[in-house]
Amino acid sequence: MAHKKGASSTRNGRDSNAQYLGVKRFGGQSVNAGEIIVRQRGTHFHPGLNMGRGKDDTLFALAAGVVEFGTRRGRRVVNIQTAE
């Protein structure tokens, strides 16, 4: 049995890129329309008032206002309270 695998063969080199997921704007912070609030895999947080959801489940603001986290029907939701 060879104890070397031969020319240009390796068992390493499989590191994946970071995904940079998580909450980007926290409760009480001011945001503008279009700003990303949460990057996530699946719907850990659900979109609430003045919030949109992208195809990769990213939550973003549809209007300028203040971020607010809460619950609705047992689900974590994110709302944007606009200054009306």
From Swiss-Prot:
Family to which this protein belongs: Belongs to the bacterial ribosomal protein bL27 family.
Ribosomal protein keyword on record: yes
GO biological process, one term: translation
Protein name: Large ribosomal subunit protein bL27
The keyword Ribonucleoprotein is assigned to this record: yes
Organism expressing this protein natively: Kocuria rhizophila (strain ATCC 9341 / DSM 348 / NBRC 103217 / DC2201)
Keyword terms of this UniProt record: Ribonucleoprotein, Ribosomal protein
Stored HAMAP family: Ribosomal_bL27
Pfam families the record matches: Ribosomal_L27
One of the record's GO cellular component terms: cytosolic large ribosomal subunit
One GO MF term: structural constituent of ribosome
InterPro entries, A to Z: Ribosomal_bL27 (IPR001684), Ribosomal_bL27_CS (IPR018261)
